[in-house]
Amino acid sequence: MANHFTYTKGIVHKTVLHDAIVETATSSAISIAGVRGVGIQITATGITTRSTVLTITVSMDGGTTYQAYSRLVSNSANTNAQGLTRVASVTQGATGTTIFWLDPTTLAGLTHFKAVATITDSGTPAGTVTVTAVKTY
């Protein structure tokens, strides 16, 4: 499912990468050539004994070869002097939502990305995970 929103400063395109998954999954390749920004949201619902680690892989050759991306910008609270917090993965261990971004200074040259959701259960699995991306042109 994709949604397009037009704002005065550009077009925002929303894509569901993983929809209510219950086991480890890799999304299809998402084109990001020419984007100005990419935001990603991971939402866990009904989680009790499940943890999800979300990593991003990126391609610079049209989606043929993918590498782990270690410059996700975390939504953590920092002072101006500390700058942005960059991480290699985001963990969602409880019901809730976490947002983060691909570092905009690294988007030039990137053509595609994939979201890899690794789900670990400790006990009887419960709950689902949904991952959504928003691209700004």
Describe each PLM feature range:
Residues 2-137:
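Surface-exposed, low-hydrophobicity beta-strand/loop segments enriched in small/polar/acidic residues
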